[in-house]
Amino acid sequence: MKTLLTLISLAFIGVIAVDAKTYKLPNDDFAIASIDMPDSWKPKAVDNGIWGQSSDDAVYISVVAVGSDKGVDAEINDTIEMLNKNKVTLDDSSKKENKFKAGEFDATEYLFQGKDEDGPAAVSITLIPVKNKLLILTYWVTTAKEKEHQQEVGQIVNSLKASS
């Protein structure tokens, strides 16, 4: 597998989710970008972003905006803490770095293989520069359900665009 989000995003360029709502990142007042997330993913707004899960809980996606190195470090630490709390273990030796397009942005993905309560899992932490800030997209999937959700994930990732 070359890269998880790279393959997914390339496969579904230009496809738009019909039942999706557009969310501004980090929020409506200070938007630097937007992303569409399907209503079926029960999206939840959080400080500086949004997260949601597929209806079967096999896929988790979050996107947050940060404006400083300190913010990046804090968000990555929060992500690792969330994964640990959800009993996700990552195999550090599996780490791969990939470059791809996330919507209209250049992105750098760090992909890990690991395990969660349902068995083998993959986790991607993607850094996306936007204006003078950074979006951090976290993707966690139960490997057995990955193909089933490729289209929806591709739609979400490729819906990223800059706010005017």
Predicted region positions:
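Conserved polar/disulfide-associated segments of primarily extracytoplasmic proteins
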Residues: 47-123, 128-129, 134-136
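N-terminal "mature-domain start" segment
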Residues: 21-49
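Sec-dependent N-terminal signal peptides
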Residues: 4-14
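Short coil/turn motifs at secondary-structure junctions
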Residues: 44, 115-117, 142-144
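Surface-exposed amphipathic alpha-helical segments
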Residues: 38-41, 136-164
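Short glycine-aromatic motifs
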Residues: 22, 40-41, 88-91, 160
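Sec/Tat signal peptide C-region and signal peptidase I cleavage site
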Residues: 15-20
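Soluble non-cytosolic domains of exported or imported proteins
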Residues: 32, 69-74, 147-151
